[in-house]
Amino acid sequence: MKTTSILFLAYLALCVQCSVPENKSTKKEISTQPIKVGVFDGHGGAQTCIWETVAAIRLDPEMEVCTITTADIANNVLDSIDAIIIPGGSGKSQYLNLGTLNQQRIKDFISKGKGAVGICAGAYLFSNTPDYTCIQLNG
C-alpha cells in the first residue's frame, strides 16, 4: 500500500508539472529580421577577397550584405549592422586606412556583442600578433 501511494503521488506530481503552462517571458524570440553584415572595402583589401566574401554571404537568404568604407565607419554605419567582416589583403594597409578612431569604433562595436570576422589579413588585423600592425582585440 505504501509503494502504491508513493507511485500515485509521483504520477500526480508528473501530471501537474506537465500541465503547467509555459512561462512565455522566459522564451527567447527568434528574430525574423535578416542579419546585416558589412564587408570592409577599404584601402588594402584585396578586391577578389571582398567580392568572394560578399558573394558567399549572399548565398544565405537570412543575411543582407553591403560593403563599407572607412568613411562609412566614421559616419556610424556600425550602428546599422550586426557584424563586420574584414577580408584578406594587406593588413598593414587596412590598419593604416582605418586609423585610430575607426579602430576604436570597431572595438566598441565588438564590445557591444556585435559580430566580427577576420579573413586572412583581416584575422591578423584583429589579433594580438607581435611585430604586426593589429587592433589587438585580446588586450
Place the predicted regions along the sequence by residue:
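Bacterial lipoprotein signal-peptidase II cleavage site
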Residues: S19-S25
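C-terminal motif of bacterial Sec signal peptides marking the signal peptidase cleavage site
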Residues: L14-Q17
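Sec-dependent signal peptide recognition
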Residues: K2-L9
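Short boundary motifs at domain starts and secondary-structure transition points
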Residues: S25-T32, N75-N76
